[in-house]
Amino acid sequence: MSSYFVNPLYSKYKAAAAAAAAVAAGEPLPAPYYDCHFAPERQQIFTTQQEAELVQYPDCKSSSANIGEEPDHLNQSSSPAQMFPWMRPQAAPGRRRGRQTYSRFQTLELEKEFLFNPYLTRKRRIEVSHALGLTERQVKIWFQNRRMKWKKENNKDKFPASKQEGKEGEAKKETHDLEDDRAESHTN
């Protein structure tokens, strides 16, 4: 690899090492060259030393740890105070979410959109979701469910819903065929 590619990377690491040494010595970091004079004062990210220590990597800075041992921060017995909210386990994994209820306005608008076109493009789904205050996923699932409902309603005439209705339909058809046969025989 040519030095053209390596030199910028090497200088970046030297600058980072110098900054780390300055922090370790308790010196403030120099302002970066891109710092704007008109920018507002920067806020501290961490309010306490304890919070700042949470983001440190003890396995990198302690060389005295035994090689076979697992670092302390990898143990599962860490206190909940050291876990960020997004790291905590969610509700019971087997529990389902509650049923989504839509307002009358949302349902009306979704129905109108469905009558116009039962399939949405991604762009239109985004527009509808923003207009109705729903997520894209909710709109997508509503349209999937509505298409299935439409399919069931339209297939009800073609295919009976249960075996009992099917038997009744066959009996009616046979009766109707017999009546047709009788009518044909009387006309001949």
UniProtKB/Swiss-Prot annotation:
Region of interest (Disordered), ranges: 152-188
A Pfam family that the UniProt record links to this protein: Homeodomain
Cellular location(s): Nucleus
One annotated Gene Ontology cellular component of this protein: nucleus
Record keywords: Developmental protein, DNA-binding, Homeobox, Nucleus, Transcription, Transcription regulation
Biased composition (Basic and acidic residues): 152-176
Secreted as UniProt keyword: no
GO BP of this protein: regulation of transcription by RNA polymerase II
Domain of life assignment: Eukaryota
GO molecular function, one term: RNA polymerase II transcription regulatory region sequence-specific DNA binding
DNA-binding span(s): 95-154
Sequence motif: Antp-type hexapeptide, positions: 83-88
Function: Sequence-specific transcription factor which is part of a developmental regulatory system that provides cells with specific positional identities on the anterior-posterior axis.
Assigned protein family: Belongs to the Antp homeobox family.
UniProt-recorded name of the protein: Homeobox protein Hox-D8
Gene it is expressed from: HOXD8
